[in-house]
Swiss-Prot record:
Organism (species): Listeria monocytogenes serovar 1/2a (strain ATCC BAA-679 / EGD-e)
Major localization listed first in the record, in broad terms: cytoplasm
Keywords in alphabetical order: Cytoplasm, Queuosine biosynthesis, S-adenosyl-L-methionine, Transferase
Signal peptide (UniProt feature, chain positions): none
Subunit architecture: Monomer.
Protein name: S-adenosylmethionine:tRNA ribosyltransferase-isomerase
Function in brief: Transfers and isomerizes the ribose moiety from AdoMet to the 7-aminomethyl group of 7-deazaguanine (preQ1-tRNA) to give epoxyqueuosine (oQ-tRNA).
Cytoplasm recorded as keyword: yes
Catalysis: reaction(s): 7-aminomethyl-7-carbaguanosine(34) in tRNA + S-adenosyl-L-methionine = epoxyqueuosine(34) in tRNA + adenine + L-methionine + 2 H(+)
UniProt gene name: queA
Family of this protein: Belongs to the QueA family.
Length: 342
């Protein structure tokens, strides 16, 4: 299919710049993936669509304050570093600006010297492999010195950085939030659990590639970025049991779908304990093996994520729903409203 087939007109004022005061006060568009019927509801209405014996699968990744500002030791030049992916030991794949100032062997100091980095390797497009040295625990040092790397379409400063974390975020490693999960509070999850819905966690560390534009004309030529995922034995067994008993598997976010479908596609539809790197690209024509329904936000035009949701329903129904969202003034993207496709 052509990437242009997934385009739609989005007024800039509908791109949410800040989160709502209350996480659960978002709106919820409910889309019947077969008929295309649309209902305009509130996010807390999601409870009525989840039944006893269903599974609600959430991604427990935690966003790192991955943007660092430092000084090149040799010259005093200001350097910005964005952590992308952990390699072996204390080495990270990073994006450096201005990259031309950091060549192999260059060193950078952050803060008062609590964190230092040495360039081990130069990559293309401003990428660098940096090895960090520090005292104590790396993630604690990062909390002190780093900033949250908000998406490029968010122009305003975030007053409370916790609002770019889910309430259940636990596993450090993401460069961006799994934003469908931002709508949940602990109280709402307790209400869902009390109804007999099983709350199950997976881990997928979201990379900045999630914001990268698709730069080919035909979707078949697109190569996805790789992201680390993990599914525990307990979670795999619980989901398999629910599916065997006829319960629905409802994924919260495209990252949860990508984790489950990566594993199911390798094991004849079954889920097993597994961790690794996935480059799965889900687009129309894909047959889902693990997931029945999806809670997600509204995505960018011509993005791999709108292609994914089009695979779960179909492109025409999704674009009709998106046009309805524009007409009804839904809020779009990371801090925007939600959609339930079932």
């Amino acid at each position: 299919m052509k990437v242009e087939d997934f385009d739609f007109d989005l007024p800039e004022e509908l791109i949410a710049q800040t989160p709502l005061l209350d996480r659960t006060s978002s709106r919820l568009m409910v889309l019947d993936k077969e008929s295309g019927d649309i209902k305009d509801q509130h996010f807390t209405d999601i409870i009525s669509y989840l039944n006893e014996g269903d599974a609600l699968v959430l991604n427990d990744t935690r966003v790192l304050p991955a943007r660092l500002h430092g000084i090149k030791d040799e010259t005093g030049a200001h350097i910005e570093v964005l952590l992308l992916k952990q390699k072996e030991g204390n080495a990270w794949e990073t994006l450096v600006k201005p990259a031309k100032r950091i060549r192999k062997g260059a060193t950078i100091t952050f803060g008062d010297g609590a964190l230092k980095a040495t360039c081990l390797e130069e990559l293309e497009h401003g990428g660098r492999i940096l090895e960090f040295s520090y005292e104590g625990i790396f993630y604690e040092v990062l909390e002190q010195l780093g900033e949250m790397p908000l998406p490029p379409y968010i122009k305003e400063q975030l007053a409370d950085q916790d609002r770019y974390q889910t309430v259940y975020a636990k596993e450090n490693g993401s460069a961006a939030a799994p934003t469908a999960g931002l709508h949940f509070t602990e109280d709402l999850l307790e209400q869902i659990s009390a109804k007999g819905v099983e709350i199950i966690f997976v881990t997928l560390h979201v990379g900045l590639g999630t914001f990268r534009p698709v730069d080919v004309e035909d979707t078949t030529n697109h190569k996805m970025h790789s992201e680390f995922y993990r599914l525990t034995e307990e979670s795999a067994e619980r989901i398999n049991k629910i599916k065997a008993q006829g319960g629905k598997v409802v994924a919260v976010g495209t990252t949860s779908i990508r984790t489950l479908e990566t594993i199911a596609s390798r094991h004849d539809g079954k889920l097993v304990a597994e961790s690794g790197w996935t480059e799965i690209f889900i687009s129309p024509g894909y047959t889902f093996q693990a997931v029945d329904a999806l809670i997600t936000n509204f995505h960018l035009p011509k993005s791999t994520l709108i292609m994914l949701v089009s695979a779960l329903s179909d492109r025409t129904k999704i674009l009709a729903a998106y046009n309805h969202a524009v007409e009804e003034q839904y809020r779009f993207f990371s801090f925007g409203d939600a959609m339930f496709i079932h």
